[in-house]
Amino acid sequence: MTNGYAVMGNSRERSLAIALGFCMMDVLLIGGAAFLSNSLSILSDLVKEIGDTTAVLAALLTLRAVRAGPTHRFAYGIGKLENLVSISIGVLMLAAAIGIAIHAFDRISDPEAVEGTEFGLLVFGVYSVIGYTIAARQFRELRKEYSPIMASQARLWMSKATFDALMATALGLTLLFQDETFSLYLDPCAALIGVVFMLHSAYAITAASVGDLLDAALEESLQFEILRCLALHFDDYDELYRIRTRRSGSRIYVELALGYAPERPMAAVSDHTERIRVALVEVLPGADITISAAALSRAQSIGLVGSEFKMA
């Protein structure tokens, strides 16, 4: 199980490292395009790209810190750490969206002809393709195992690619109809449409992460799967004392306390608990399963005294 997490962690880190490289290159290219042009969409994209790059860098550093640290140190805190990073990404996207909206409304109230956008148009076109490619890669990672960091990054890159595609379209139409009056409003209007995408992504990221920031028991559907698994393995234990579950970010933790008759050999008890653990891992992939076994008292073993069952 540990090796599986390590491989998954390396895959996530590799995806983020690739994304960071493209982000840094994009900042340089968009910075050059903004210098050559007076386009609001290009300038606003530069501001957004700086925020995106910071968010990707923070996510990458978080995963590296977790991988470098001792496993037991981050056993429960990793979920909170992932969600805090996701919330930070949402806040950065919100701040960038507000800045873009302010500049867009200023440009609508005081229209200005856009010049020198050819290089920016090329950059937007290329990076819209790159953005959709990276987003698709990260969505594939999410299908293997959910992670708040990767979920926020996938949404961020989908939003970024859509924004770049809109900006490329707006700049292309502005060049095509540069002699028409309405072309003066295409640039700021495209920026406002991009703001809507950014606000939606920021809300989705923050709402999902805030809900997971506080540890909580698993939802009823997953608890039912645990009970169904225990029912199928009814002969593998003599008493069920307690079930405790929790979700911390992308990680699921299940703790079972089972009772066994004193005459059962320890080797048999170990085999029984292992069968239950394997069955639970099949219905809860990637979950951390802990099963503790205790000997029944003599009264319990002959059926005279029942035990208390708790599920949390």
Map each language-model feature to its residues.
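Alpha-helical transmembrane segments and adjacent TM-loop junctions that form the membrane-embedded core
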Residues: T2-I18, F35-S37, S41, D45-A312
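The first (N-terminal) embedded transmembrane alpha-helix
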Residues: I18-I30
